[in-house]
């Protein structure tokens, strides 16, 4: 028995490298087949995917239409509304100013935006519908604003059910006709849903970040981002304000309704982009291409630097991609965040802290970070695999199942992380 075991051990050591577990490589054919099935099954009108691995492009696949009614196919230069994938761009902009010493992460928000000095927590409602308000247990800090623990709301998805969402509905802080300064004044009048630090709750806090960029830099938000992120990185197709010529490349958005995909009227989504409205949200609004956003993702993969251009210090990028949530915040107080996978939240980014815990969980590597956008957009950066991925489509409402299946197409259904982890 001992001789047999020793012989087996020797045989294993002598195995050629090809017999060992092969390094992970994305299967471009599998990704293309997945996109084709999405379109063939009527789950979206068109989609594209770009994968960058080990310092080079690994895959670009595009299937279906950018505009079904015009019979215009998805192309490499198609423009997409990325919605909440705007948020990491805003976070990078604000953290550049943090590097310059313009603020501290634990500064009370009111030090830099005085309109928030009188924030109250909504603690129910009186019989006449008026809010019951109380003082928060502590001040909202900029760190809270960066990690969605301020207690802010994003408004109700449907009929308002509490005093904070009713105030949002009445004040409409993010109305397209408002500037970011006007947004912030209105937002400061909306009561907090929770005490600062008590809950993770997705909110308009990233739009507050955009206003902070304006106040701390002395520049309009979109101008700052263009000068300090887009232009240095060569992201020529990215921005909020668009020209009429851009319509020829713009992907239309479609709403899934009663088994059909219905075009979304432009007025519901694109007025700030094409009609000169003043709002430039920090949490949404950028229109870009998969290549431009991949440039941004590659900068993140490069620890803040791309092609010799430094946007952030490596230490700042590590801070952004480290879980910032207090472990004492229970799962039930993290809204829908646990559905993104085994992890937490950094600065405007989900951060994976453990391998997938079940077959139903999104595939990914420990240390990856990502975010997504309302029309089922998605990007992620996987440092362990030296990989960045951008998935682009314009299917509303947000389709989490589509993302889970796309990740399986990229990684394989059984992926748990790099070999040896």
Q: PLM features: what roles do these ranges have?
A:
Residues 1-6:
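Bacterial N-terminal signal peptides that target proteins for export
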Residues 14-18:
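N-terminal signal peptide c-region/cleavage motif recognized by signal peptidases
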Residues 114, 118-363:
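Short, surface-exposed loop or secondary-structure junction motifs
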Residues 368, 375-385:
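Short, surface-exposed beta-strand/loop micro-motifs that present aromatic residues
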Residues 64-66, 268, 395:
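A generic structural motif
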Residues 29-38, 49, 55-57, 80-109, ...:
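Active-site SXXK
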Residues 22-82, 102-104, 118-125, 400, ...:
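Short, conserved catalytic-motif segment at the N-terminal edge
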């Amino acid at each position: 028995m001992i001789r047999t075991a020793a012989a087996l051990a020797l045989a294993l050591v002598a195995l050629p490298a090809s017999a060992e577990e092969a390094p992970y490589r994305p299967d471009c054919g599998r990704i293309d087949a997945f996109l084709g099935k999405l379109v063939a099954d009527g789950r979206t009108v068109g989609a594209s995917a770009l994968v960058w691995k080990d310092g080079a492009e690994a895959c670009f696949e595009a299937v279906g239409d950018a505009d079904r009614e015009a019979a215009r196919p998805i192309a490499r230069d198609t423009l997409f509304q990325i919605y909440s994938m705007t948020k990491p761009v805003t976070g990078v902009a604000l953290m550049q100013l943090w590097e310059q010493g313009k603020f501290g992460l634990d500064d009370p928000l009111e030090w830099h935006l005085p309109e928030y000095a009188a924030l109250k927590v909504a603690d129910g409602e009186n019989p006449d519908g008026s809010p019951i308000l109380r003082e928060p247990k502590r001040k909202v800090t900029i760190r809270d604003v960066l990690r969605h623990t301020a207690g802010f709301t994003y408004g109700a998805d449907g009929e308002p059910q509490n005093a904070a969402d009713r105030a949002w509905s009445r004040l409409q802080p993010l109305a397209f006709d408002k500037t970011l300064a006007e947004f912030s004044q209105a937002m400061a009048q909306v009561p907090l849903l929770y005490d600062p630090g008590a809950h993770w709750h997705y909110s308009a806090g990233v739009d507050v970040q955009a206003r902070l960029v304006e106040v701390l830099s002395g520049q309009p938000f979109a101008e700052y981002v263009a000068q300090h992120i887009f232009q240095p990185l060569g992201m020529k197709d990215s921005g909020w304000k668009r020209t009429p010529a851009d319509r020829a490349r713009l992907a239309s958005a479609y709403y899934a309704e009663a088994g059909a995909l219905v075009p979304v009227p432009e007025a519901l989504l694109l007025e700030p982009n094409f009609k000169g409205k003043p709002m430039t949200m920090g949490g949404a609004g950028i229109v870009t291409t998969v290549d431009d956003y991949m440039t941004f993702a590659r900068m993140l993969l490069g620890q803040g630097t791309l092609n010799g251009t430094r946007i952030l210090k490596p230490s700042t990028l590590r801070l952004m991609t480290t879980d910032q949530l207090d472990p004492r915040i229970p799962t039930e107080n993290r809204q829908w965040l646990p559905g993104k996978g085994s992890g937490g939240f950094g600065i405007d980014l989900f951060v994976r802290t453990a391998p997938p815990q079940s077959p139903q969980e999104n595939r990914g590597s420990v240390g990856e970070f990502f975010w997504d956008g309302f029309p089922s957009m998605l990007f992620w950066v996987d440092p362990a695999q030296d990989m960045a991925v951008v998935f682009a489509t314009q299917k509303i409402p947000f389709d989490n199942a589509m993302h889970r299946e796309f990740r399986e197409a990229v990684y394989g259904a059984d992926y748990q992380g790099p070999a040896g982890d």
